[in-house]
C-alpha cells in the first residue's frame, strides 16, 4: 500500500497526542476537584455578594426611580384627565342649557310669528271680503239698472212687436195706448 508523506506525518502527530493524553488522564478538571471546593465556594459567595450589592445599590434604585416617576406621571395624567372631564361636563351642561333656552325662544318667536301671520291673514281676508262685498253690491246695482233699462226697452220692443204682429196678422191698425196697456197687463 502506498502512503503519502502528509498522511504519515498526521499519524505521527496523532500518536504523540495520545501519549500526552495518557499522562494527563490522571488529573481532574480543577472546577470539579473537591480539594479546591472551599476556595470555589468562597469566590462564588463573594461574586454573588458583589453582584447583589451592585443590583441593590445601582439597578434597583434606578428602577425604583423610574417606577416612582411613572407613578407620579400617571397620577398627574389622571388628575388632569379628571379636571378636563369636569370642564367638559360643565361645558356640555352649559351648552345644553343654552340650547334649551334657544329652543324655547325659537318656540316663542315661532308662536308670535304664527299669531302675527294669522292676524295679517285674517285682516287681509276681511279686507278682501269687504272689497268683494262692495263689488258684489255694485255689480248687483248695475245688473238691476241694466235689467230695469232692458225691461223698459223690452216693454217698448214688445209694444212695437205686438203692433207689427197685429198689423201683419190681422191687417188692423191698433192704437199704441191699447197695445201698451196689453203689454203692461202681461207684465212687461
From Swiss-Prot:
Transmembrane feature ranges: 35-55
One Gene Ontology CC term in the entry: proton-transporting ATP synthase complex
UniProt KW keywords: ATP synthesis, Cell inner membrane, Cell membrane, CF(0), Hydrogen ion transport, Ion transport, Membrane, Transmembrane, Transmembrane helix, Transport
InterPro entries noted in UniProt: ATP_synth_b/b'su_bac/chlpt (IPR002146), ATP_synthase_B_chain (IPR050059)
One Pfam family linked to the record: ATP-synt_B
Domain of life: Bacteria
GO MF annotations, alphabetized: proton-transporting ATP synthase activity, rotational mechanism; proton-transporting ATPase activity, rotational mechanism
Membrane topology of the entry: Single-pass membrane protein
Localisation: Cell inner membrane
Function comment: F(1)F(0) ATP synthase produces ATP from ADP in the presence of a proton or sodium gradient. F-type ATPases consist of two structural domains, F(1) containing the extramembraneous catalytic core and F(0) containing the membrane proton channel, linked together by a central stalk and a peripheral stalk. During catalysis, ATP synthesis in the catalytic domain of F(1) is coupled via a rotary mechanism of the central stalk subunits to proton translocation. Component of the F(0) channel, it forms part of the peripheral stalk, linking F(1) to F(0).
Subunit structure: F-type ATPases have 2 components, F(1) - the catalytic core - and F(0) - the membrane proton channel. F(1) has five subunits: alpha(3), beta(3), gamma(1), delta(1), epsilon(1). F(0) has three main subunits: a(1), b(2) and c(10-14). The alpha and beta chains form an alternating ring which encloses part of the gamma chain. F(1) is attached to F(0) by a central stalk formed by the gamma and epsilon chains, while a peripheral stalk is formed by the delta and b chains.
Family, per entry: Belongs to the ATPase B chain family.
Protein name, per record: ATP synthase subunit b 1
Species per Swiss-Prot/TrEMBL record: Bartonella quintana (strain Toulouse) (Rochalimaea quintana)
Lineage of origin: Bacteria, Pseudomonadati, Pseudomonadota, Alphaproteobacteria, Hyphomicrobiales
GN (gene name): atpF1
Amino acid at each position: 500500500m502506498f502512503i503519502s508523506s502528509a498522511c504519515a506525518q498526521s499519524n505521527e502527530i496523532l500518536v504523540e497526542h495520545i501519549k500526552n493524553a495518557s499522562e494527563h488522564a490522571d488529573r481532574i478538571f480543577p472546577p470539579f476537584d473537591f480539594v479546591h471546593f472551599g476556595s470555589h465556594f468562597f469566590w462564588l459567595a463573594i461574586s454573588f455578594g458583589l453582584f447583589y450589592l451592585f443590583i441593590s445599590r445601582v439597578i434597583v434604585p434606578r428602577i425604583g426611580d423610574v417606577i416612582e416617576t411613572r407613578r407620579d406621571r400617571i397620577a398627574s395624567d389622571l388628575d388632569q384627565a379628571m379636571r378636563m372631564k369636569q370642564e367638559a361636563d360643565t361645558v356640555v351642561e352649559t351648552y345644553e342649557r343654552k340650547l334649551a333656552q334657544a329652543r324655547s325662544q325659537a318656540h316663542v318667536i315661532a308662536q308670535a310669528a304664527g299669531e302675527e301671520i294669522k292676524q295679517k291673514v285674517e285682516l287681509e281676508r276681511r279686507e278682501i271680503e269687504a272689497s268683494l262685498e262692495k263689488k258684489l253690491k255694485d255689480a248687483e246695482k248695475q245688473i238691476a239698472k241694466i235689467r230695469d233699462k232692458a225691461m223698459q226697452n223690452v216693454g217698448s220692443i214688445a209694444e212695437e212687436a205686438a203692433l207689427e204682429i197685429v198689423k201683419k196678422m190681422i191687417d188692423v191698425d191698433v192704437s199704441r195706448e191699447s197695445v201698451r196697456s196689453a203689454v203692461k197687463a202681461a207684465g212687461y
